[in-house]
């Protein structure tokens, strides 16, 4: 019997599906963190494949800051309804009561209270012992050294010096009461892999990833798309329509657009072939201080 050769993308797909099934079988109360971006869309697609024709054996969790793009919220609700997924949405009530605002309080405090603390609140509230995330090792150097099974203590903290070996796709999921893991099925994927797989599998994505004329202003070296009226213009700032798209999505005041004419998936794939910069270069939360992502992850960030 001839052995079937798997393409690079099919090998990645098989590995991710294996990881998702392992976690679903091994842990009592898993959840999939759904941030609405391209990686979340791929991860959800893989999870649906893993359990087809059945439904997902775990819910989706969106930790909402109240500052996502409107198109992201519309896409989130439409996707959950179309696929019949259980969608949990959590917003830090203390942060809401405090009126936490990225413009007033800055990116570091906004991220810590609305995202990190919000995530920990949700994990504690529902008692999840495993949480799938869409992080990839090629995104950022602290993520590059993180294991696929990323262990967290009872305070959801990550210790990069206390990670378990992962040999030959064998994962040790033993945890003590109160501990949990974050699981990254897309760890070995690259940004180019993600886009090629989206094109190959015809996966639906937020339209913000495709270039279009959008209202933007330049601030702190970033092209900020103005998504609503919660912004005060600084002296000399002018909102202009420019042809832009997003390589990564987050809170709109903290996520920069890139000038681009790529309006189709093949054009994006071609653009990525010659790109020499990280997709996270325009995420303000990654610029807070040196090693800011690792510090956030140590405190319980995604």
Swiss-Prot record:
InterPro entries assigned: PAPS_reduct_dom, Rossmann-like_a/b/a_fold, SO4_adenylTrfase_ssu, Sulfate_adenylyltrnsfr_sub2
Record has ATP-binding as a keyword: yes
Subunit annotation: Heterodimer composed of CysD, the smaller subunit, and CysN.
CDD domains xref list: Sulfate_adenylyltransferase_2 (cd23946)
Family in the record: Belongs to the PAPS reductase family. CysD subfamily.
Pathway given in the UniProt record: Sulfur metabolism; hydrogen sulfide biosynthesis; sulfite from sulfate: step 1/3
Keyword Transferase: yes
EC class name: transferase
EC numbers on record: 2.7.7.4
Function, as annotated: With CysN forms the ATP sulfurylase (ATPS) that catalyzes the adenylation of sulfate producing adenosine 5'-phosphosulfate (APS) and diphosphate, the first enzymatic step in sulfur assimilation pathway. APS synthesis involves the formation of a high-energy phosphoric-sulfuric acid anhydride bond driven by GTP hydrolysis by CysN coupled to ATP hydrolysis by CysD.
Keywords attached to this entry: ATP-binding, Nucleotide-binding, Nucleotidyltransferase, Transferase
Protein name: Sulfate adenylyltransferase subunit 2
Catalytic activity entry: sulfate + ATP + H(+) = adenosine 5'-phosphosulfate + diphosphate
Gene Ontology biological-process entries: hydrogen sulfide biosynthetic process; sulfate assimilation
């Amino acid at each position: 019997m001839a052995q079937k050769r798997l393409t690079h993308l099919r090998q990645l797909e098989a590995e991710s599906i294996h990881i998702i099934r392992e976690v679903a079988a091994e842990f009592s109360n898993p959840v999939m963190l759904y941030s609405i971006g391209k990686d979340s869309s791929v991860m959800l697609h893989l999870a649906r494949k893993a359990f087809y024709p059945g439904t997902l054996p775990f819910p989706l969790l969106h930790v909402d800051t109240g500052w996502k793009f409107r198109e992201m919220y519309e896409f989130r609700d439409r996707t959950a309804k179309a696929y019949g997924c259980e969608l949990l949405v959590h917003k830090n009530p203390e942060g809401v009561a405090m009126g936490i605002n990225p413009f007033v309080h800055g990116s570091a405090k906004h991220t810590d209270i609305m995202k990190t603390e919000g995530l920990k609140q949700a994990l504690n509230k529902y008692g999840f012992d495993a949480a799938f995330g869409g992080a990839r090792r090629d995104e950022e150097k602290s993520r590059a050294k993180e294991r696929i099974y990323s262990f967290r203590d009872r305070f959801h903290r990550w210790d990069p010096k206390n990670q378990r070996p992962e040999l030959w796709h064998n994962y040790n999921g033993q945890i003590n009461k109160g501990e949990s893991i974050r699981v990254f099925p897309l760890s070995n994927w690259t940004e180019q892999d993600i886009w090629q797989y989206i094109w190959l599998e015809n996966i639906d994505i937020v339209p913000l990833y495709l270039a279009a004329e959008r209202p933007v202003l330049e601030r702190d070296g970033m092209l900020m798309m103005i998504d609503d009226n919660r912004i005060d213009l600084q002296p000399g700032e002018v909102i202009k329509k420019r042809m832009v798209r997003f390589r990564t999505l987050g809170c709109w005041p903290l996520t920069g657009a890139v000038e681009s004419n790529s309006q189709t998936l093949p054009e994006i794939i071609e653009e990525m072939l010659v790109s020499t910069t990280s997709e996270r270069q325009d995420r303000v939360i990654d610029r807070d201080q040196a090693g800011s992502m690792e510090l956030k992850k140590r405190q319980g960030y995604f």
